[in-house]
Amino acid sequence: HANAVKEILNNTKIDLDLLGFHGQTIFHDSKKKITKQLGDGKLLSQLIKKKVVYDFRQNDLKNGGQGAPLTPIFHNLIANKYLKKELDKSYSVNIINIGGISNLTKTVEWDKIDKKKEVIKACDIAPGNCLIDEWVRKNSKKRYDANGTLASIGNTDRLILNQALENFNIGPPYKDSLDIKDFDISFVKGLSLEDGVSTLADFTALQISRALNYFKDPTKKSIFLVCGGGRKNKYLMNSILRSVDTVKELNETNFVPVEDYGIEGDFVESQAFGYLAIRSLLNLPISFPDTTGCNDSVSGGVMINNF
């Protein structure tokens, strides 16, 4: 991590004041209030000789939250700063992150938050890339299904898919923080590489589409903007669009990658934790009752100046 930071600083000549360091989550159990990320914030600060904010999730867990998702406040920032200049107020703007797990943020206007008329709502809604990636890694030399190529070759086993959908009832309602260990790929055991990928991708898409249907605003036109690696999986994105559970009005103009609105989707997550680090420094909330389930809006993160 330190080498990566040093390389970026050397290449960009950025004068860094503060680094938000999340690390790699290796275990997360919201019910037991346990979360563990790889990465030593103290050592990183020492090596790069900069202030570091790390351990973002613990304070939320201590205050009754589930420790995730933490990015909604940043999703709300970019929705207000960039998206709502192009979209009129008749739109309900939702941001979906399809990473290992999929989560959704219903954004609101800042002035409505300030006046306490509305709150940001967010939650984990479904698996994201985790099932597809695990299957591909276990059954091939590839690490993931680039562009959904393998899934597009395969044929979905509808019987297995329907049984899996009955067995994995995620929501609605959507209350629990999800971890990749909440799911497994055993239900596609015995299928070919391609058929397994196709079945898992359609399973993921149907779970996501159920959530989109649940969270659509009945009083406004809904737009869903997608970030995270899953947006690059063409098969997955098309499967969400053609899903029988999908919002009827959903199409290729209102279910789109965030790049369509000038936002770099590969860096939303990293930018989010930079923003959370600043909010932590200012002791501003990073999690909220309607995003993580915490008892009250709380800040989070530990700042270290270890040099």
What are these regions, as identified by a protein language model?
Residues 27-31, 58-65, 119-122, 191-195, ...:
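A short glycine/serine-rich beta->alpha loop
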